[in-house]
Amino acid sequence: NTILYIFYKHDKLPNDLNRTIAGLVKDYIQQICASIMDERFDDILHQANPPFIYAEAYDDDNFMIAKSKGAWTVAALAKEGEIDSTLTTLVKETQRVKQYGFTPSEYERARINVLKQYESAYNERNNQKNDAYVREYVNHFTNGGYIPGIEMEYTLLNQIAQNIPVEQVNQYIQDMIGEDNIVIGLTGPDKEGIKYPSEENLLRTFLKARQMPVEPYKETVSNEPLVPTLPTPGQITETKTGQPFGATVFTLSNGIKVVLKPTEFKKDEIIMTAT
């Protein structure tokens, strides 16, 4: 797998501020920015012939192993022979955010998603595994920050989310995407037949893409119902209770078998899989 990275290095929030409400605000905005960028990358994946298989964005408080710098990072798993086009796409999407920011509706969706994650963590606070606490304490010891507990964090995040406008989010992300102090990384297998671009070619592609004109992000919103015409309802033709592990098996009129297994592992969660 060939993975392409662009690191936009930036100064970190000082530790004495990172352990205050300022650190929580910063983390909230970073999660919002990453969520919206990931949504935009997902839109590209649904277009014809995307150059990458997967792409994401995130802010790394530690650039690589450096403790003194953070980095707004965009990364993608490039398709074979599509390294240059992947780099071009990542740069153009980043420049789109740099120039125009995010839309209010994008922010609202991301805000709901982020708060939902914290709500889920809050609801599952009594089912938390030990390793989650260990990771949090280790991160606090090595990187600083805050560990107020999910009860306090959930309460504060709800207050913060109500008072952070999209303009503040846009100002943050546009400050993070600098014009210099940028690192391009490329990793892949040392395999016969695979050709990688030189450092000069990567730089040339990056600079060229950064000069390309980009338009504001345009959302395509459909008012059409998800299912325009509801199908004729089927029926449950057979119900088997007392199955292994407390499951119930329903046989439907179309021949599909549905296995229902209630658990108390998590609250407010339904998992569905099909084969």
Residue positions per predicted region:
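Proteolytic maturation boundary segments
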Residues: 1-42, 46-48, 108-112, 119, ...
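A structural supersecondary motif
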Residues: 7, 34-77, 136
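Acidic/histidine-enriched alpha-helical segments
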Residues: 52-56, 96-134, 157, 181-192
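Short, flexible segments with low predicted structural confidence
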Residues: 61-62, 132, 140-145
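M16/insulysin-pitrilysin zinc metalloprotease superfamily fold
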Residues: 64-123, 145-146, 159-163
